[in-house]
Structure formats: structure tokens, C-alpha cells
Amino acid sequence: VSGTFSANALFAMDELLQKKPDLVFLDYSVNDPGQYYLQEAFEGLVHHFLENGTYVCVLLFCNQNGNCTRGAMTRIAHYYHIPLLDIGSVVMENIRENRFLWQDYASDYVHPRIEGHEFIADNIMHCFQYAMEKEETNSYIIPENPCFDGSFWKLEKLENLSYDDDQVFTVDKYCSVVVAEYFQTAQENDCKVEILVDGEVKECVELHWEFAWDNRLVRMIFVEPKADWHTIEIRPAGGKQNDQELLKQFDIKLGIGCLLED
């Protein structure tokens, strides 16, 4: 989904798995800015797909300066012994060798133009050809331990939340990290909520933003170095109840993660 983080995909991966794909490409290298919870989310995606019998290929792109979230994603790909195509590095190498210019590849600072997509497709097909020529005799085994902390190896998703008469949702969970995903629209409204952990307001999120893309956003609500029991609460911001239809459109979901413990 355009303009989203790998943490958004945590909420969509099971829907994708219903299609029973043989292979998925994960492309978040120019969207994820590199925060801890996003590298945890990316590893959670890789592990979940592999655990469900779907193979994974990591795609790395870059901005016009050659930058992306290369470090963490490369480390995860190597750790899980899955293919990684660093298209961004290939693009920058071609530019350094004067084979083409950035504007020949992209229409702006990051998005490929038609010729750029053709270049990407050619490189992916080359990877397929290489894979078919290489004989693989060993069966794939998923690592027993995570590359990083494994916070989203066992993700619990809370969806279709039920609010009480005061439009408050409360739940107690043993966790170390909590993310919230929600819809945001450019259509003007005053629907907003506070998300609290153990009585402390962590985030205030709004359904409206004038520059919204009318898609789903994700926020890291809470992260701790050690898992424990916590009370998570969603309530109207400022004590003012929201329109029920707008609250339904908001469609807030929670992702509950927990560090793997010995």
C-alpha cells in the first residue's frame, strides 16, 4: 500500500495470506525511517510469512541521494537466508558509471517513472532466472531465534474495538510494544481520541488532517525494554464524545507485541 510503513503491513498480512501466495516482495526501504519498532515490525513480517509457508524477497530502493533503511533490512534478509535485491545500489552504480541519470529512472526524488519500473522488472526477472539456474538441495529452515528482539514474532491484533457508553475502550495486556493503526482523511471533522498506557496519555490521534491521503496510518504508542502487564485505553480527546459514524470510520486497531523471553 502506497505511503505506508512496514508496521501497517502487520495488520494486512493475514488478509494477503488468504490468497496463498508462493512469494511476496517486501518493499519498505524508502518508507520506514528506521525506528526500532519498524525494524521489529519488518522482522515480524518476514517471520510470519515464512512461518505460513510463503517465501519472501526483500526489495531495497533508495532516494536520489542513495539512502534507504538498508542496514536493518539487509541484516534481516541475511539472517533469514532470503533473497535481497538492492535495486537502489544498482541504480546509483549505473548513475556513477554514467549509464543513465537519476531523472531517467525517477519522476521525483524517489518514485520510479515508467522507464524506472522497466529497469526494476528487468532486475527482478534476472533474479528469477538466476534462481532457476541454481540448484537448491537443502530444505529451508526458519531460524529458531529472532534477528533482533522478536517483538512481533507473536503479534496480537485487536480489531473491531468495542467501546463503552462513554466511548472508552480498555484492555490489559502483557506486552513490551504497542502500535496503533487508523484511518485518516482530508475531509474536515473534529473526531479525535487519546491513547493511554497505564493512565498516561501517549498519543492524541485525529481522523482529520488537511494533507491526509485518505489511507491508513500507524503510530508507535509504547515501547519498553522489558515486557510487563499494562492497561491500554482509548478515550475521546478532551472528554468530548465523537460522532459514532466518524469513530467507526476512524477504525482504530491495536498491535500488541512482546519481547521473546527465555
Name these PLM-found stretches.
Residues 8-134, 185-189, 194, 198-261:
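Alpha-helical cap/lid subdomain in secreted, periplasmic
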